[in-house]
Amino acid sequence: MSATIEIQNDIALIRMDDGKANAINFEMVAALNETLDKAEAGAKAIVLAGREGRFSGGFDLKAFASLGPEGVYKLLDAGAELLLRLYGGPLPVVAACTGHAIAMGVFILNACDTRVGASGDYKIGANEAVTGMNLPIFAMELSRDRLSPQHLTRAMIQGFIYDPAGAVEAGYLDMLSEPDKVEATALAVAGQLAQLPGKAYAWNKKSIRKGTLDRIKASLGAHHKL
């Protein structure tokens, strides 16, 4: 499985691990949606983690090369719908950024409520400007919401890649932990968030983010128009 789930003490720990870059393809999206179904049914908060040294390298470029334009648009929409689920879903979501997070990997971070990152020699950022790709609407909207305004141009238009400390300053991460403690730290944060009244958390989260959520929803199926 490319994503697994364990639920203990009302906290769902979801791990992405495809043995490689944790690339986002249809298989990974389906696996994550399945784990989120289980989390929403049986937990009060979620921790989303990668594997050691790697959170996610972004969309699966091999899949992009083989899918053709329409298939690529469908994968982009599937990724956008996953981000909508994380960003607008009812449960607190804490990211345990265990290593490199690139492109779609950082947009997943942006969709999580609190982001705990591993300190160390890791790369975090959106490289679309460097690789010559247009940013999807969901990437722009989430970045406007979560990144520091002072870093938005550098991060999203110029494709700057940050180290973990710089990622905190830019707004990709909220805090750092030692690499061997990042998952435990994220679980502790999730445990604290799970104590908050769940209905109010869900309502406030969705209401405050409604504008961003609506703009992303409106972009589904329209990537070819960018």
What are these regions (language model features)?
Residues 139-150:
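Hydrophobic, secondary-structure "cap" segments at the distal end of domains
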Residues 1-49, 84:
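Conserved CoA-thioester-binding segment of acyl-CoA-metabolizing enzymes
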Residues 114, 154, 158-160, 166, ...:
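Well-ordered beta-strand positions
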Residues 83-131:
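Glycine-rich beta-to-alpha active-site loop
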Residues 116-122, 168, 173-220:
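C-terminal long alpha-helix characteristic of the crotonase
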Residues 48, 108-110, 167, 186:
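Hydrophobic/aromatic residues within transmembrane alpha-helices
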Residues 30-31, 42, 50-82:
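Glycine- (often His-adjacent) and acidic-residue-rich active-site loop
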Residues 84, 106-107, 140, 153, ...:
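Alpha-helical segments flanking ligand/cofactor-binding loops in enzyme cores
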